[in-house]
Amino acid sequence: MATADHEATGLDCDHAIRRLLRRIDAHIADEPRDSPVRRYLERELGGREGTEADTRLVVHAQINVVRELFERRSDADGLRLLSNIERECC
């Protein structure tokens, strides 16, 4: 269900953020264990026991690192999803 302020766009922010986190997890798993980006994102995004709003804040705070990860992985779909989330959800 989209939040009230995002109903006009049709983007379900909570669902989009869950999709984004799955993409991040997949890319992190492919990064070398000693990758600074991997270690950083595992530390910052590792604990997701909070609410959807908490997760949204964490993603927003790490948006540039996530963008860097997607760029390094040439993930155009991930970058597009990230941009939509940044524009409509954060």
Swiss-Prot record:
Q: Which Pfam families match?
A: CowN (PF20543)
Record key words, sorted: Nitrogen fixation
What biological-process terms (Gene Ontology) are attached? nitrogen fixation
Q: Which NCBIfam families does its entry note?
A: N2Fix_CO_CowN
Q: What does this protein do?
A: Is required to sustain N(2)-dependent growth in the presence of low levels of carbon monoxide (CO). Probably acts by protecting the N(2) fixation ability of the nitrogenase complex, which is inactivated in the presence of CO.
Q: Per the similarity annotation, which family is this?
A: Belongs to the CowN family.
Protein name per its UniProtKB record? N(2)-fixation sustaining protein CowN
Q: What is the lineage of its organism?
A: Bacteria, Pseudomonadati, Pseudomonadota, Gammaproteobacteria, Chromatiales
